[in-house]
Structures are given as structure tokens and as C-alpha cells.
């Protein structure tokens, strides 16, 4: 049974008594409400349900007098209402002005209601459920012409437009970064919003960018212009130029021509007011729209910018087009599927994750200024939407009538899985399908297998398995602390949602904090169970505020103890405020589990920290050399260098073997590697740029530490014949002869 996680309703986010009191006096203001940490998209002063979409809390308007298409529940669904025939033939405000006042009075209420729906939104009964759509969504459904005629109502689009309205309402937000699947309708929806906003804005500019200038032009000529052309006369402002322009759609008064006759008769040209607003498109480039002020920028196909164009560089430029000082005056509607990572997908991925609403700076903004939204493919896949716009997730007991009139006899999840199973033997084809029709964010950013050093098929099998809800509770986040805050006593693990450690297993109590003392040195008591690998750092701060993170991984090996065999059980990828905090974190983990650590010694402060505290016995020596051949520093603090080509190759081979044997689908089931960040780092590992892969370095060292015997050098045994001084005789015949 499919359980959706795209959104949830929060019935208790604000006390009902507070909502009723504020509703009574229409006191809820459109925008961000800091007191209740919610974005209010109601323009009536009243709020109803509160949605949470991708961690963004949004208060919807209170729905009164919802429209009913029919009194029967099963006949209640969205249906575009045709414009009255008397108004259908009126093409412009000039035609309207020619009609008598009696005719106009008849239609003023109808026109006023349409403007009200455009401003405040619209609610209707959908299969017996009152359903709210924003004003922008209403304009898309009711008055926008797309390639198939009238758009269908889809629940996924409703949630999209609610999220978009929240982006517009929030003064901290520059817009949205929408990670989509193919044929989701984003190009038409964003085109409809361009026309909707441009036709009610004065002295404004609206822009379009895409993966190439030709694509931006096509979007303008084939989507934006037809939508504008088919608007009813009461929404259509005065337009300058051609009816179907190629480069710019201008809502302004055309220049009046003064003829000799008009001048001689002193006839004044008719005074008209225009919006002085334009919609245009630009060629793709890092500096497109540089220095211009925009009210809305539509960024289509932003995950497909090929070199030398860079979406990150362009966003840094166009972001300034949407603000005056600290005040945000425009918004960006960005959306795309993702190309392979080296074909523009990597930059879009960085931009998407920089738009996480849970990670804000002190100004309350995300790193990019945008808000990220991902709608899984099952919400908008063609052929699996019922009459009410709701996806058919699971296979129904009886066929369901689709929005296109065809019957749906099995669910979209089953269909998607069948497609995936059919592509199992074609890794690149499978990953392309994942990128086009993703069910998770990880699917959307799948890379091409030919670019990876390791077996991407098995890595992604494990990632998909981990994403299953059944495996979501295996990992626990938390921190290690000394008992009572006293160093060198017992270490205790405390769960903490903001902790730096992720663990999947802790040893039984009798195996915790096992420390052996010998020769005035402390040694780990559980070396036979497993070991740690670590990629440390030495400097607390960096000039750019970035720097690589410290990484630590714990892995078990085969043992007779009560512990899982050959399993990663700990992941630490973090950069605390000071290096000393990191050193102590690593030390406490080693002591709690009672296991040694194999760390890179090129940055030796961590290992000196171990030695200074009396834990030199926990630091493993490099396994590829006997003790007699170690350098003086290696004898003092242990560790392994990362500069040797032999070590680099052995390290990569260790990860490769681990993936083949213990990751993804194996003979006994799926692997037990539950750490997604490490799996994703393995997937994009580049052996020529190892410094960018902290998780891969430390996890590989953990594997080597658990299999140290494989790397022990073996001396060649040479058998040499040594003469002992005895003569040898040939006794054939009657006389013995000396053998020379």
C-alpha cells in the first residue's frame, strides 16, 4: 500500500481558538507569519487548513461556498466553464466600449467574480471534498490554452501552485527550484504565470531563460504568446506590435500617428493607458539579464546547461535582478529534470540542495534564496490520473476511469517498477529512466555508469533499498559524550536529531568501553570485532568558510561475538567549529566501540591527539609495511600516507571489492550498507580528485583496517644449495669414480 509523503496537513500547528479569533476579524495577513512560523497565502484575512509541503508550512484560505458542479458526489470534479456566448465574440476592450451600458451592466458581476477568483483563488467540490486552488492555478485551468486545449486538473499541480504562492508571499524567498519529471507541465504552468502576472503589472519586465536560446524562443512563441492571445478581453491589456511577436510581448499603448488632417483639424489622439510591461527571452549565458530589473524570471530546463554555460554562475547574476538592496522585488520560477552530472546536472544538484528550507542563514534565507520542491513521478505520470485529478498509486480492485476517459486497471507504482525491471540489464538506460521519471531525489540525480569507477548498478540498488520506508528507522543520529563530562572515563552515546554521528549498531553493554592497559599504553579490546577508518583535517577554520569535512567510518569483520559481520555501522561526516571537537569525537567513538583506527597521517594532529592522551595503541600502523621499515613519524603516531600510488590503488580496490560483495542485491538478499551519503560519494568517486571525497577515503580505510592481513608484505623464500664438503661417487661398474 503506497503511503504518500509529499505533503501533510497540520491540524494542531496553530490552536483552533487562535485561528477562530483572528478569522473573526479578518486579521491574518498575506505573507510570512513569524509568530506561528507559517506562510499565509490567504488574501481574505481568514485561514483554514495548514499544509506542510517539503518542510514549508503554508496556511490556506478558509473555504466558503465551494462551487459544486453537481449534487452527486461522483459527478463533482473540475470542469472548465466556457465564457458566455455574448462575451465570446468580444476580442478587446475597444469592442467592449462600443456596447451600450445596459449590456455592460448585465456582465459586470461575472467579470468582477473572475477578477476575484484570480486574486483570491477558487474552491470547488472534488469527489465530495472541498478543494482550494490558488488564483494562479485558477487562471491556468480556466483561461490558459495549452497544446491539448484546456489543462486538466491534477492534484500534483494544485500542490505545486500552493507551494509557488507561498514562495511569492514569503518576503525572504526569491522563488522556487523545482526538481521535476518529464511531461509534468512545468513549461505551460510557468508560461501561464508569466502572462497572468504580466497582465496585471505596470512598468515591469518579465524574462525567460532555458538550456539554449532556441528553447527559450520556442517557449515564448509556442506557449506564452498563445496563452496571452486567448485571454478573454477583460483580462487582456492593450498590446503593442504584432499579435504573435517573436522576441517581445509588449503590453503598452502603440505610438499614435499624427496625420496632416489631424493636425489641421486640431484633433487630439485618443488618450489610452497601457501597462508598459514586457515579456521577452534571452540567449543562454552566465550573464543573461545582467543589470536588468525583473519582476518574474522563468528558468526552464535549468538542470541541462552544458559547458561553458553554468546555471550556478547565471543564478548569482540573475538573483541581483530580483532585488533592490535587501528587498526582494521579483521572483524566479525555476524547474527542470536533471541531466547526467557532468552534463549540467551537478550544478543544478548543488543549486537544488542549496535551496533547502530547513537550512537558512541569519537573514532567514536559504543559501540560494530559492525554495526547493520535488514532486515524485507517481503524482503526475500520464495515463494514471483519475477523473478527479488524483493519481492511481496502487493497482485498483476494479478498473478506474482516467481523466482521459480510458480505464486504469493497474497502479502507477507497478507500471514504474515494470519499466525499471525491464532495464536492469541496461545500466545507462535505467539511470536515464530514473532521471526522467524519478520517485526520489536520488533517482533524479542518477549519473551515467560509464563515468564511475565502481559498480553503480549495485550502489543504486542499495540506495533504492535504503529509501524504502521499511529501512528508514535503522539509523540513529546522535553524539558521544564522556560520562559526567570527565575525560578518559566511560563514553556514552546520546541520540540527538542534530548529532554528528549516524549509527546502525552499538555493541552489547559488556563489549562497550573495553580498554586494555599494557606497557603504560591503552589498547582497544575489540580489535577482533572491527575497526575504524578516518580522513581527518588539521585546521579549525578556512578563509572561504568551506574546507573538507572530517570523516569517520566504523566497520565490523567476521567474529564470533554478538556483532554483525562485514557491516558498516557508523558514519561521521562533519566539520565542527574547532578541530579539537573533531579529534575528541573520533577518540570517543574508538573508545566506546573498543576498536582501533587507521587514519591518514598526512594531517597528523588527530594522531598526535591520540598519542598525547595515551591512546597510541588505538592508532594502527600502516598494514603494507613491517614495523622495521616504518619511518620515525609512523612509528611514533601510526597512520597511513595518502600519497603513495600503491596505497591509492589498494584503497580503491578495497572499496570496489566491498561493493561487489556486500552492497546491493547479493545471493542472500540486500546488503547492510545503510549510509546514503557514503553510497552517493562512492557513486561519484574520482580517483584523480580524492580530496573531494572524504566519505570514500575514510570508508576505504575502514575496509583496509578490517582486512589488514591482505596488505602484509610477504618475503620471498629462496632456497640456496650450500656445499657441505662431502665427495660424491658414481658406483656403476666395478670401480667407483668421483663425481666432479
Task: Describe each PLM feature range.
Residues 2-175, 685:
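Pre-P-loop entry segment of helicase/translocase ATPase cores
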Residues 2-27, 38, 44, 191, ...:
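RNase H-like, metal-dependent nuclease domains and their acidic two-metal-ion catalytic environment used
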Residues 172-194:
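Walker A/P-loop
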Residues 175-177, 205-207, 296, 596:
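Residue-level preference for the first positions of well-ordered beta-strands
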Residues 197-204:
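Post-Walker A helix-loop "phosphate-sensing" segment adjacent to the P-loop in P-loop NTPases
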Residues 205-285, 463-464, 470-474:
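Conserved nucleotide-state-sensing and coupling region of NTP-binding domains
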Residues 316-329, 335:
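Substrate-engagement module of ASCE P-loop NTPases
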Residues 619-665:
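Short alpha-helix plus adjacent loop in nuclease-associated cores
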Amino acid at each position: 500500500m503506497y503511503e504518500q509523503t509529499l505533503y501533510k496537513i497540520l491540524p494542531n500547528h496553530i490552536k483552533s481558538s487562535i485561528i477562530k479569533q483572528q478569522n473573526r476579524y479578518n486579521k491574518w495577513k498575506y505573507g510570512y507569519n513569524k509568530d506561528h512560523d507559517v506562510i499565509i497565502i490567504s488574501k481574505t484575512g481568514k485561514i483554514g487548513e495548514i499544509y506542510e509541503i517539503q518542510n514549508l508550512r503554508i496556511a490556506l484560505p478558509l473555504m466558503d461556498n465551494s462551487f459544486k458542479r453537481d449534487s452527486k458526489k461522483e459527478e463533482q470534479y473540475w470542469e472548465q466553464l466556457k465564457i458566455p456566448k455574448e462575451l465570446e465574440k468580444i476580442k478587446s476592450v475597444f469592442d467592449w466600449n462600443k456596447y451600450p451600458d445596459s449590456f455592460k451592466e448585465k456582465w459586470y458581476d461575472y467579470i468582477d467574480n473572475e477578477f476575484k477568483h484570480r486574486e483570491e483563488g477558487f474552491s470547488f467540490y472534488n469527489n465530495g471534498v472541498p478543494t482550494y486552488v490558488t488564483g494562479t492555478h485558477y487562471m491556468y485551468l480556466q483561461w490558459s490554452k495549452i497544446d491539448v486545449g484546456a489543462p486538466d486538473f491534477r492534484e500534483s499541480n494544485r500542490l505545486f501552485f500552493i507551494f509557488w504562492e507561498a514562495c511569492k508571499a514569503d518576503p525572504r524567498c526569491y522563488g522556487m527550484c523545482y526538481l521535476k519529471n518529464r511531461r509534468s507541465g512545468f513549461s505551460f504552468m510557468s508560461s501561464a504565470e508569466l502572462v497572468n502576472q504580466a497582465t496585471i503589472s505596470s512598468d515591469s519586465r518579465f524574462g525567460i531563460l532555458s538550456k539554449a536560446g532556441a528553447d527559450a524562443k520556442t517557449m515564448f512563441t509556442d506557449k506564452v504568446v498563445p496563452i496571452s492571445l486567448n485571454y478573454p478581453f477583460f483580462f487582456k491589456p492593450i498590446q503593442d506590435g504584432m499579435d504573435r511577436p517573436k522576441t517581445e510581448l509588449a503590453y503598452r499603448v502603440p505610438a499614435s500617428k499624427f496625420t496632416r488632417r489631424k493636425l489641421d483639424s486640431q484633433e487630439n489622439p485618443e488618450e489610452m493607458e497601457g501597462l508598459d510591461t514586457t515579456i521577452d527571452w534571452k540567449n543562454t549565458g552566465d550573464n543573461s539579464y545582467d543589470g536588468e530589473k525583473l519582476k518574474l524570471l522563468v528558468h526552464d530546463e535549468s538542470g541541462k546547461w552544458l559547458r561553458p554555460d553554468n546555471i550556478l554562475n547565471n543564478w548569482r547574476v540573475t538573483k541581483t535582478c530580483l532585488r533592490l538592496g535587501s528587498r526582494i522585488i521579483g521572483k524566479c520560477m525555476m524547474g527542470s529534470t536533471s541531466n547526467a552530472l557532468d552534463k549540467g546536472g551537478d550544478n543544478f544538484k548543488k543549486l537544488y540542495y542549496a535551496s533547502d528550507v530547513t537550512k537558512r542563514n541569519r537573514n532567514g534565507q536559504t543559501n540560494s534564496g530559492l525554495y526547493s520542491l520535488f514532486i515524485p513521478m507517481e503524482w503526475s505520470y500520464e495515463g494514471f490520473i483519475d477523473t478527479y485529478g488524483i493519481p492511481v498509486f496502487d493497482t485498483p480492485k476494479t478498473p478506474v476511469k482516467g481523466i482521459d476517459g480510458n480505464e486504469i486497471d493497474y497502479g502507477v507504482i507497478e507500471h514504474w517498477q515494470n519499466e525499471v525491471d525491464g532495464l536492469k540489464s541496461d545500466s545507462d538506460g535505467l539511470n536515464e529512466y530514473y532521471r526522467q521519471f524519478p520517485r526520489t531525489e536520488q533517482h533524479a540525480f542518477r549519473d551515467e555508469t560509464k563515468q564511475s569507477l565502481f559498480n553503480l548498478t549495485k550502489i543504486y540498488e542499495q540506495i533504492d533499498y535504503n529509501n524504502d520506508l521499511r529501512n528508514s528507522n535503522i539509523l540513529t543520529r546522535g553524539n558521544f559524550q564522556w560520562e559526567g563530562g570527565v575525560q578518559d572515563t566511560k563514553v556514552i552515546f546520546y541520540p540527538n536529531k542534530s548529532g554528528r554521528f549516524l549509527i546502525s549498531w552499538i555493541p552489547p553493554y559488556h563489549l562497550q568501553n573495553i580498554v586494555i592497559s599494557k606497557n603504560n599504553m591503552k589498547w582497544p579490546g575489540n580489535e577482533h570485532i572491527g575497526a575504524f577508518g578516518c580522513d581527518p583535517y588539521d585546521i579549525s577554520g578556512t578563509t572561504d568558510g568551506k574546507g573538507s569535512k572530517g570523516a569517520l567510518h566504523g566497520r565490523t569483520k567476521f567474529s564470533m561475538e554478538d556483532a554483525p559481520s562485514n557491516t558498516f555501522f557508523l558514519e561521521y561526516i562533519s566539520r565542527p567549529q574547532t578541530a579539537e571537537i573533531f579529534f575528541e569525537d573520533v577518540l570517543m567513538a574508538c573508545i566506546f566501540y573498543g576498536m582501533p583506527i587507521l587514519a591518514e597521517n598526512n594531517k597528523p594532529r588527530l594522531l598526535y591527539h591520540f598519542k598525547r592522551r595515551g591512546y597510541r595503541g588505538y592508532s594502527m600502523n600502516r598494514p603494507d609495511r613491517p614495523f622495521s621499515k616504518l619511518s620515525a613519524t609512523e612509528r611514533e603516531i601510526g597512520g597511513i600516507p595518502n600519497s603513495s600510488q600503491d596505497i591509492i590503488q589498494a584503497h580503491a580496490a578495497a572499496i570496489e571489492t566491498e561493493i561487489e560483495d556486500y552492497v546491493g542485491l547479493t545471493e542472500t538478499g540486500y546488503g547492510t550498507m545503510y549510509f546514503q551519503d557514503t553510497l552517493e560519494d562512492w557513486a561519484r568517486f574520482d580517483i584523480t580528485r580524492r580530496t573531494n571525497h572524504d566519505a570514500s577515503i575514510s570508508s576505504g580505510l575502514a575496509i583496509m583496517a578490517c582486512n589488514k592481513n591482505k596488505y602484509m608484505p610477504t618475503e620471498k623464500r629462496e632456497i640456496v644449495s650450500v656445499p657441505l664438503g662431502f665427495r660424491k661417487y658414481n658406483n656403476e661398474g666395478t670401480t667407483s669414480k668421483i663425481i666432479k
